[in-house]
UniProtKB/Swiss-Prot annotation:
Residues 39-52 have a biased composition (Basic residues). Residues 39-78, 235-266, 1012-1079 are annotated as: Disordered. Inhibited by 4,4'-diisothiocyanatostilbene-2,2'-disulfonic acid (DIDS). Homodimer. Interacts with CA2/carbonic anhydrase 2 and CA4/carbonic anhydrase 4 which may regulate transporter activity. Isoform 1 but not isoform 2 interacts with AHCYL1 (via PEST domain when phosphorylated); the interaction increases SLC4A4 isoform 1 activity. Interacts with AHCYL2. Residues 492-501, 543-550, 610-692, 746-779, 837, 895-901 are extracellular. This is Electrogenic sodium bicarbonate cotransporter 1. NCBIfam families: ae. The keyword Cell membrane applies. The keyword Transmembrane helix applies. Keywords: Cell membrane, Ion transport, Membrane, Phosphoprotein, Sodium, Sodium transport, Symport, Transmembrane, Transmembrane helix, Transport. The gene is Slc4a4. It comes from Rattus norvegicus. Residues 53-70, 1062-1079 have a biased composition (Basic and acidic residues).
C-alpha cells in the first residue's frame, strides 16, 4: 500500500447499491463503520480533479466498459465480498504510518487479576493468567502455572470487548504516581461522564484497592490480631447501615486496603525469576475483572498512562504499569467478564494492537485496532474443536511484519530467506547488494570496502568479549589443526616432502592471522582445499618429468596468479558474484559438505584396514592364537640372560649392537621394532590388533552423536536456560574432552594426533625462502602465466562462492561484506606463501560455516513458549586471529595435543559436514523425493510451485552435483573450478525450462530479469499516477466502495451483557451493529 491517503473521488464516481438478493443470499451482513472526523483532518490539502485525474477516470471507465458482462458481474460480487480497504485498515494506516522518531514501543507483560473470595470470606484480586506472547493460566488445584499455549478466544467475547471500548471510559496519556491516585482519577472521570453514581465511588474505590495475591506468593498465616481486624467481605461492610457516613466509610476502608499497597516493589517481586523472560525496558498492562453486588451496570475503564509508573504489588513482576483495563459488573456474569479480560489481554500481546495501543489518539483508534484484529482472526467450528484443548506454541511464529507493513507502507515481505515476493517473482539474490555494485572506477570497489569496514575496526575487537567467543576459538582451532595435519600429510606425499605438515601449520597460521586482522569479512576461515592439492600434485610431477625446479616454477605461478587476482580487484570483477544464485551456492556448499562426510568415513575405513579385526577369533580357544618375533638367523643371539636388554633400553641400541655386541631377547620387541630390526613375525594373530578398530569407531560415532545432541540441548526441557545455553555453546569441546577421557580410561592404543615438535622445513633440500631465479630457464617465468590462469579461476571461484555463502542475508550481518578487500588479501598472501614455499590458502566453505554457527546470537530473553529469535552473528576479528595464532603455536603444544585420538577429530569432521547441510533448501527438497505427499512439510515453495516442477529442479541439481563429484575424483579435478563456473551457465539455461514465478520460489532471480522487472514497475507507477497501489493488483476498476466488517447474524439477536437484566429492549440495547448498518 501507499503511505499517502486515498483520494476522494466523490460518491457519484461509482456507487454500489445493495440489492435485496445480495443481502438475503448470504448468512452474514456487512456493517460500515463511520470514519471519525479526525481521519478527515489527517488528510492533506484537497485537490480538485484536474485534467490528469479526469483523463484517468475516462481511461478506467473505458477499461471497465470493455470487459464482458460476466467479468463485470464477477467484479461486482467480489467488491461486495472483499472490499479493498476496510475503515479499520484506513485508520490504522494513519496510526502506524505516521513518521515518528520515537523508539519502538517496549514489550508488554499483561496480567489478568480477578476479584475472588479467599477462604470463602475476604475478597482479593487473584492473578489467574499472564501473557507475554502466549497465555499461561494458574492451574485450578496444582498451584502452578500451565505450559504456555495459544490463547483461544470466543468470538462473542471479542464483540463484547468492542462494545466495552465504545461504552466505557477511555483515558489516554493520564498522569498518576500511585494506584490510589489512579483509582481516584478513574472514579471521578466515571462520575463526570455519568457512568457511575457518586454514592458508589467509595465502594468501587475500596474494591479496586483490595490486596493483590500473585501465584508466586504462598498463603500467609495470619496472626490472631489480624483475624479480628480484617473485614469478612466487602459486601457485608457496605450492607451494614451502622457504618457511618460514606466519607467515614471511605476513609476507614481505604486505609485498611492501603495497608497492602506500596509504590515500591516487594521482595517477592524482586526475587521473581520470571523477570529473566522480560527485556529490561518492559512495561506492564494490568487487567482487573470481577463481579460485585453493588453495581447495576458495568464499570469499564481503559487507561493509558503518560509515563509508566511502578504501582507496588499490582503486578507480579517489578515492572512499571502503562495500561490498566478495569471491568466490574453485576453478579451472575463472572464467566463473561473472565472471557472479556482474556480477550483484552490477548489483544495487548498482539504485536499490531500493541503498537496501536501505544499510538492511539482516541477511542476510535482503539476500536479500529479491535476491528483489524477481527479481520485477521480465525474461527474454528464448535463441533470440530474442543476449546479446553491447549494449542502448543508453534516452533516458528508467523511474522507480523506483513500486517504492519501493509499499514505503514513498508517493503514487501520476504520469502525464500532473502528474496522479496513481488507478485510471485523474487528479487535477484545478490543483485541489490551494495558491496557488489560496479563502480566503474579504478579500485573503486576496494576503496568502498575499506571505507565501509574502517569504522567497525575497533568494534571488531571489543565485540568478541563474550564467553561464546571462547567456545568458537577452541572448536575452530581443533578443526583447523586437524585439517592442517591432514592436508600437510597429503601434500607431503604429493610433493616428496617439499611441502609437509610443518609448512601447512606455518602457512595456515601466517595467512589466516593476517587475513582475519585486515580482510573485509573476518568470519571467513582460510584453509587449503582439494583442488589446490590436485594442482600441486600435477605441478610437482610435471616439474619432475621436465627437470624443472618445482619451488621456483611454483613461485612464478603464484606471482602471476596474484597479479591476475589484483587485476580482478582493480576492475571490480567481484560484481560477477551476483550471478551466483542459490542454485550455484547450494551445489558448491553441498559438495564440500559431502566431501567432509565422505573423507571422515574414508579415514575410519583406512584405519580399520590398518588395524584389522580378527573375525576368526573364537572364545575359549585363546591358546590357538599367538604371535612371536624370531631373529633373522637361527643362531643363539640371546643365550646369556645376564645381558638381556629390557624394552626401555631399545632406543639406545643400534642394529649392529643387536647382532654383534649384545645378546638380545627378541620376545621383548614390538611388531614395528621386530620388522625394523629384520626379525620375523610368526603366528596366526600377527596381522590383527585387538580392540583398536572397535574403540576407534566408538570414539568416532560417539563424538559425532554427542556433538549433535549437545548442540541441540539449548531447546531441551532439562536444566535451567543458562546451563542449556552453556552446554550448547561448548558442545564440540565438551564432546572432545569426554571421549578423550574415555579413551584414556579404557587404555586402548588408538592412533593419536601427531604434531611436529621441531621448527624446521620438512625436506632438508629446501629453506624458508625460494629464490626467483637460477633454477629454471628464463622462459619458464613467462610460461608460468598459463597455469596461473587456471589457478586464478580456482582461487576466485573458491573464495567468492564461500564469501557469498558467509554473507547471505539470513545470517543478518550488520557490518557489511568486503568481496574486493578479501580477494586483495588472498592475492597478497599468495605472494608471501609462494616466496616461503608454503601452501596457498583460500576460503574454506565448511569451516567458515561452522565458524558462523558457533557465533550465532539469539535473544537473551524470550517469552514462555516462544523460541529464541536469531539476532545475527557476533561479527569480530578476535576468534579467527586467535585460532590461527594457536595453530602456529601448536608445534610447542605437541605434548598436550598427542593425547587427542584421531577418531575423535574425524568425528568432528563428520559433525561439520552434517551441520553445514542444516537449513540448506536443496537438502529439504531432496527429502521430498522420498516423502509421501500427505507427510510433506508446509514449505512456502510447495504452495506456489507444482510438485513435479520442484522434483525436476532438484533432479537437475543432483545431476550437476554427481558430475562435479565424478570430476573431482579423477585426474581432471584440476578443471574443477571451471566446472563450478559452468553451474552459472546451467542456471542461466533454466530460465528457458522454468518460469520466473517458479524460480523466484526455488532459487534467486538472475539480476537482468530483476532489473527489467523493476524498470517495468517504474513505468507502471508513472502511468498509475496517484491511484492507490491496491488497485494495481486488482481486476476491478477504482471505486469508492463502502468498506465493511462481517458480523455473524446471531450476534445481533443476543442481548448485550451491558444491558440491564430486563426483557430484551431493542431500542435500549442497540449496538454498533444497528447504528452503522450500511445496507
Amino acid at each position: 500500500m501507499e503511505d499517502e491517503a486515498v483520494l476522494d473521488r466523490g460518491a457519484s464516481f461509482l456507487k454500489h447499491v445493495c440489492d435485496e438478493e445480495e443481502v438475503e443470499g448470504h448468512h452474514t451482513i456487512y456493517i460500515g463503520v463511520h470514519v471519525p472526523k479526525s481521519y478527515r483532518r489527517r488528510r492533506r490539502h484537497k485537490r480538485k480533479a484536474g485534467h490528469k485525474e479526469k483523463k484517468e477516470k475516462e481511461r478506467i471507465s473505458e477499461n471497465y466498459s470493455d470487459k464482458s458482462d460476466v467479468e463485470n458481474a464477477d467484479e461486482s460480487s467480489s467488491s461486495i465480498l472483499k472490499p479493498l480497504i476496510s475503515p479499520a485498515a484506513e485508520r490504522i494506516r494513519f496510526i502506524l504510518g505516521e513518521e515518528d522518531d520515537s523508539p519502538a514501543p517496549p514489550q508488554l507483560f499483561t496480567e489478568l487479576d480477578e476479584l475472588l473470595a479467599v477462604d470463602g470470606q475476604e475478597m482479593e484480586w487473584k492473578e489467574t493468567a499472564r501473557w507475554i506472547k502466549f497465555e499461561e493460566k494458574v492451574e485450578q488445584g496444582g498451584e502452578r502455572w500451565s505450559k504456555p499455549h495459544v490463547a483461544t478466544l470466543s468470538l462473542h467475547s471479542l464483540f463484547e470487548l468492542r462494545t466495552c471500548m465504545e461504552k466505557g471510559s477511555i483515558m489516554l496519556d493520564r498522569e498518576a504516581s500511585s494506584l490510589p491516585q489512579l483509582v481516584e482519577m478513574i472514579a471521578d472521570h466515571q462520575i463526570e461522564t455519568g457512568l457511575l453514581k457518586p454514592d458508589l465511588k467509595d465502594k468501587v474505590t475500596y474494591t479496586l484497592l483490595r490486596k493483590h495475591r500473585h501465584q508466586t506468593k504462598k498463603s500467609n498465616l495470619r496472626s490472631l490480631a489480624d483475624i479480628g481486624k480484617t473485614v469478612s467481605s466487602a459486601s457485608r461492610m457496605f450492607s451494614n447501615p451502622d457504618n457511618g457516613s460514606p466519607a467515614m466509610t471511605h476513609r476507614n476502608l481505604t486505609s485498611s486496603s492501603l495497608n497492602d499497597i506500596s509504590d515500591k516493589p516487594e521482595k517477592d517481586q524482586l526475587k521473581n525469576k520470571f523477570m529473566k523472560k522480560l527485556p529490561r525496558d518492559a512495561e506492564a498492562s494490568n487487567v482487573l475483572v470481577g463481579e460485585v453486588d453493588f453495581l447495576d451496570t458495568p464499570f469499564i475503564a481503559f487507561v493509558r498512562l503518560q509515563q509508566a509508573v511502578m504501582l507496588g504489588a499490582l503486578t507480579e513482576v517489578p515492572v512499571p504499569t502503562r495500561f490498566l483495563f478495569i471491568l466490574l459488573g453485576p453478579k451472575g456474569k463472572a464467566k463473561s467478564y473472565h472471557e472479556i479480560g482474556r480477550a483484552i489481554a490477548t489483544l495487548m500481546s498482539d504485536e499490531v494492537f500493541h503498537d496501536i495501543a501505544y499510538k492511539a489518539k482516541d477511542r476510535h483508534d482503539l476500536i479500529a485496532g479491535i476491528d483489524e484484529f477481527l479481520d485477521e482472526v480465525i474461527v474454528l467450528p464448535p463441533g470440530e474443536w474442543d476449546p479446553a484443548i491447549r494449542i502448543e506454541p508453534p516452533k516458528s511464529l508467523p511474522s507480523s511484519d506483513k500486517r504492519k507493513n501493509m499499514y505503514s507502507g513498508g517493503e514487501n515481505v520476504q520469502m525464500n530467506g532473502d528474496t522479496p515476493h513481488d507478485g510471485g517473482h523474487g528479487g535477484g539474490g545478490h543483485g541489490d547488494c551494495e558491496e557488489l555494485q560496479r563502480t566503474g572506477r579504478f579500485c573503486g570497489g576496494l576503496i568502498k570496502d575499506i571505507k565501509r569496514k574502517a569504522p567497525f575496526f575497533a568494534s571488531d575487537f571489543y565485540d568478541a568479549l563474550n564467553i561464546q567467543a571462547l567456545s568458537a576459538i577452541l572448536f575452530i582451532y581443533l578443526a583447523t589443526v586437524t585439517n592442517a595435519i591432514t592436508f600437510g600429510g597429503l601434500l607431503g606425499d604429493a610433493t616428496d616432502n617439499m611441502q609437509g605438515v610443518l609448512e601447512s601449520f606455518l602457512g595456515t597460521a601466517v595467512s589466516g592471522a593476517i587475513f582475519c586482522l585486515f580482510a573485509g569479512q573476518p568470519l571467513t576461515i582460510l584453509s587449503s582445499t582439494g583442488p589446490v592439492l590436485v594442482f600441486e600434485r600435477l605441478l610437482f610431477n610435471f616439474s619432475k618429468d621436465h627437470s624443472f625446479d618445482y619451488l621456483e616454477f611454483r613461485l612464478w605461478i603464484g606471482l602471476w596468479s596474484a597479479f591476475m587476482c589484483l587485476i580482478l580487484v582493480a576492475t571490480d570483477a567481484s560484481f560477477l558474484v551476483q550471478y551466483f544464485t542459490r542454485f550455484t551456492e547450494e551445489g558448491f556448499s553441498s559438495l564440500i559438505s559431502f566431501i567432509f562426510i565422505y573423507d571422515a568415513f574414508k579415514k575410519m575405513i583406512k584405519l580399520a584396514d590398518y588395524y584389522p579385526i580378527n573375525s576368526d577369533f573364537r572364545v575359549g580357544y585363546n591358546t590357538h592364537f599367538s604371535c612371536a618375533c624370531l631373529p633373522p638367523d637361527p643362531v643363539n643371539l640371546s643365550v646369556s640372560n645376564d645381558t638381556t636388554l629390557a624394552p626401555e633400553d631399545l632406543p639406545t641400541v643400534s642394529s649392529t649392537d643387536m647382532y654383534h655386541n649384545a645378546t638380545f631377547d627378541w620376545a621383548y620387541l614390538s611388531k614395528k621394532e621386530c620388522v625394523k630390526f629384520g626379525g620375523k613375525l610368526v603366528g596366526n594373530n600377527c596381522d590383527f590388533v585387538p580392540d583398536i578398530t572397535l574403540m576407534s569407531f566408538i570414539l568416532f560415532l560417539g563424538t559425532y552423536t554427542s556433538s549433535m545432541a549437545m548442540k541441540k540441548f539449548k531447546t531441551s526441557r532439562y536444566f535451567p536456560t543458562t546451563a542449556r545455553k552453556l552446554i550448547s555453546d561448548f558442545a564440540i569441546i565438551l564432546s572432545i574432552l569426554i571421549f578423550c577421557v574415555i579413551d584414556a580410561l579404557v587404555g586402548v592404543d588408538t592412533p593419536k594426533l601427531i604434531v611436529p615438535s621441531e621448527f624446521k622445513p620438512t625436506s632438508p633440500h629446501r629453506g624458508w625462502f625460494v629464490p626467483p631465479f637460477g633454477g629454471n630457464p628464463w622462459w619458464v617465468c613467462l610460461a608460468a602465466a598459463i597455469p596461473a590462469l587456471l589457478v586464478t579461476i580456482l582461487i576466485f571461484m573458491d573464495q567468492q562462492i564461500t564469501a557469498v555463502i558467509v554473507n547471505r542475508k539470513e545470517h543478518k550481518l550488520k557490518k557489511g561484506a568486503g568481496y574486493h578487500l578479501d580477494l586483495f588479501w588472498v592475492a597478497i598472501l599468495m605472494v608471501v606463501c609462494s616466496f616461503m614455499a608454503l601452501p596457498w590458502y583460500v576460503a574454506a566453505t565448511v569451516i567458515s560455516i561452522a565458524h558462523i554457527d558457533s557465533l550465532k546470537m539469539e535473544t537473551e530473553t524470550s517469552a514462555p513458549g516462544e523460541q529464541p529469535k536469531f539476532l545475527g552473528v557476533r561479527e569480530q576479528r578476535v576468534t579467527g586471529t586467535l585460532v590461527f595464532i594457536l595453530t602456529g603455536l601448536s608445534v610447542f603444544m605437541a605434548p598436550i595435543l598427542k593425547f587427542i585420538p584421531m577418531p575423535v577429530l574425524y568425528g568432528v569432521f563428520l559433525y561439520m559436514g552434517v551441520a553445514s547441510l542444516n537449513g540448506v533448501q536443496f537438502m529439504d527438497r531432496l527429502k521430498l523425493l522420498l516423502m509421501p505427499l500427505k507427510h510433506q512439510p508446509d514449505f512456502i515453495y510447495l504452495r506456489h510451485v507444482p510438485l513435479r516442477r520442484v522434483h525436476l529442479f532438484t533432479s537437475l541439481q543432483v545431476l550437476c552435483l554427481a558430475l562435479l563429484w565424478i570430476l573431482k575424483s579423477t585426474v581432471a579435478a584440476i578443471i574443477f573450478p571451471v566446472m563450478i563456473l559452468a553451474l552459472v551457465a546451467v542456471r542461466k539455461g533454466m530460465d528457458y525450462l522454468f518460469s520466473q514465478h517458479d524460480l523466484s520460489f526455488l532459487d534467486d532471480v538472475i539480476p537482468e530479469k530483476d532489473k527489467k522487472k523493476k524498470e517495468d514497475e517504474k513505468k507502471k507507477k508513472k502511468k498509475k499516477g496517484s491511484l492507490d497501489s491496491d488497485n494495481d493488483d486488482s481486476d476491478c476498476p477504482y471505486s469508492e466502495k463502502v468498506p465493511s466488517i462481517k458480523i455473524p447474524m446471531d450476534i445481533t439477536e443476543q442481548q448485550p451483557f451491558l444491558s440491564d437484566n430486563k426483557p430484551l429492549d431493542r431500542e435500549r440495547s442497540s449496538t454498533f451493529l444497528e447504528r452503522h448498518t450500511s445496507c
